[in-house]
Amino acid sequence: MERPRGAADGLLRWPLGLLLLLQLLPPAAVGQDRLDAPPPPAPPLLRWAGPVGVSWGLRAAAPGGPVPRAGRWRRGAPAEDQDCGRLPDFIAKLTNNTHQHVFDDLSGSVSLSWVGDSTGVILVLTTFQVPLVIVSFGQSKLYRSEDYGKNFKDITNLINNTFIRTEFGMAIGPENSGKVILTAEVSGGSRGGRVFRSSDFAKNFVQTDLPFHPLTQMMYSPQNSDYLLALSTENGLWVSKNFGEKWEEIHKAVCLAKWGPNNIIFFTTHVNGSCKADLGALELWRTSDLGKTFKTIGVKIYSFGLGGRFLFASVMADKDTTRRIHVSTDQGDTWSMAQLPSVGQEQFYSILAANEDMVFMHVDEPGDTGFGTIFTSDDRGIVYSKSLDRHLYTTTGGETDFTNVTSLRGVYITSTLSEDNSIQSMITFDQGGRWEHLRKPENSKCDATAKNKNECSLHIHASYSISQKLNVPMAPLSEPNAVGIVIAHGSVGDAISVMVPDVYISDDGGYSWAKMLEGPHYYTILDSGGIIVAIEHSNRPINVIKFSTDEGQCWQSYVFTQEPIYFTGLASEPGARSMNISIWGFTESFITRQWVSYTVDFKDILERNCEEDDYTTWLAHSTDPGDYKDGCILGYKEQFLRLRKSSVCQNGRDYVVAKQPSVCPCSLEDFLCDFGYFRPENASECVEQPELKGHELEFCLYGKEEHLTTNGYRKIPGDKCQGGMNPAREVKDLKKKCTSNFLNPTKQNSKSNSVPIILAIVGLMLVTVVAGVLIVKKYVCGGRFLVHRYSVLQQHAEADGVEALDSTSHAKSGYHDDSDEDLLE
């Protein structure tokens, strides 16, 4: 589609409407740790901590959708309807397991969080706020359920009827710690902030007055939920070792802080007055003992991020306005410069995904193009290969469609921006080694964007479409324990269409697709894929949900209330193991409006537990059953036991995905294109980049110049193949020193009183230095060659389309001190 500049035409808004802010954010998610991103003009969406947070407000109604249908139907042609049998007595079973709760308040927004895993505990915070001329009046109510939302109890008295600051959300502790922190609003003249803490799954709360005013939500250590850190409004870094009972300021002038492994804290600090003034000159510090001792591990820092086992820093280059990514795998003790193009002030880097084996890195293109290049790393995170050109990633708002399909290893989906400004979806099944278009669903026709009505592709709507306010209520959905299932909105043609999308499903991790539902829907997965539930996205009141017990082939509709509600959100426990779904919305009369939830338990639909005969063997990534390499991805095959579509039974909460791996012989598919090589579109072999032909491949690693001899291939990080093809590849140490990083803490840590000593030493050694230079010039031929080789590699990076430009200081002018979201998203 053409890149929309605003909301799509024809999207009507109901004056009072409903706004859904649906955020499913697991704690410490790497997902997209964006480095250097120029901040959006508006404040970013607030991020709730904890396993999952869902927030709804009374704004903006959804655009109109199809009228809900009753009964049952099959995806595809109407003639196939007779293939779908009606589940016996499902209406009576669901009616007996539908629970309504009406919330007796008129709050304008609702936030919901699960506390713990499989505990059934849900906290709901409702907020009502009226801004007055000078101050604002606010009221909060807190509700608790311990049966997955079937019943709620008002526990506002446990927080002394205090107004809770919704921008901090509900900070839920990791794992099953049962810890909850709510940040309260305090009067302007107070010495510090106030929090309410619970360590028993919100049965009781303790009020604690803070010695500082918090700037950010309390951050739990992933290893010990008693350890907390927070930033103050005065940029102090505060740490608690006893779940917030007592706090200690361990450092001042802090811009951004993050927990690392083993309770390590990384943070940036300014030295010249403010984070804004020092952007690009920040220092990166580390403490391994909660603030007793510190080590400066980097200077000239623009931003930093964590992903997998890698620590990243964006560093200002010497005597330049460009930045380079540096990588450490030992918590910052040593650094190496990533073999990536440098970026200018108006550009950014973004960590799209990172695990223990590799990194997906986006490098923005110069200018306001809205796209860049995806690079994939080696297992050290240092040497990168080009993976995908013209990757859509807008600078305004910072939107990318990059999606990790968690239901099948190695699969990612994203969008590219074509030269005609149309947006197309691409998918990789081998962790970025090769990208291709999504296959056209068999039960769909090509739309008006297709030049050939018989040949087109499926294009997926994700974050970018949502940001442009298209009629797309949800991003793509997949779950690790619902093997192979992917659900997404999309259109079928030559590019993404602005027309009303339909919902598509894949049951094999994205290899094949089928239209599942007509028109936009909200959807969720229950019982590890045993049930899929959907609700139509409509601006009219609704009272119908749809569900499928065969991975979206056949659908039943159920009227959950006789009084339709204005729908605001669909909520289910994270992890896709629950049998319960909650429908949230409100009812409205002439003068009143009330929040209401309906929780539907599907336990009686799947009455029996699944047995061995209910499962069948499925070979993942299978595309050619006659080929001995069929199913080989990243060096091995995986056979799964999957629930038969015809089996109506319950996987249960204890269900564990059963899989049997087997190693494959190595082939071209097990190799990425090496440094200096790329795969043309729809090609399997790697070819040399034109701008590198005739040049020797040399790069700087750990301060030593290395020479690369390659046939164009390097093994994909994490690939398990053995034997078979083994392309020649050799890295040789040239025994020459080079600049492997721009971080040099020792220079920054020099005290001012050491300057005379340094000057004296320099004066005494001046003659020796001059003589040494003359000797080197006369007898050593490698020095000039070394500098030349390094500059050649830099020219290659620039020729690759990401050269350094004169800065317009977009990033700096947009940065503001009161938000850590500007440095890393």
UniProtKB/Swiss-Prot annotation:
Location in or out of the cell: Golgi apparatus, Golgi stack membrane; Endosome membrane; Endoplasmic reticulum membrane; Nucleus membrane
Annotated source species: Mus musculus
Protein name, per record: Sortilin
Signal sequence extent: 1-31
S-S bonds: C84-C554, C255-C275, C446-C456, C610-C649, C632-C664, C666-C721, C673-C686, C700-C738
Induction: During adipocyte differentiation.
Propiece span(s): 32-73
Domain notes: The N-terminal propeptide may facilitate precursor transport within the Golgi stack. Intrachain binding of the N-terminal propeptide and the extracellular domain may also inhibit premature ligand binding.
Origin organism lineage: Eukaryota, Metazoa, Chordata, Craniata, Vertebrata
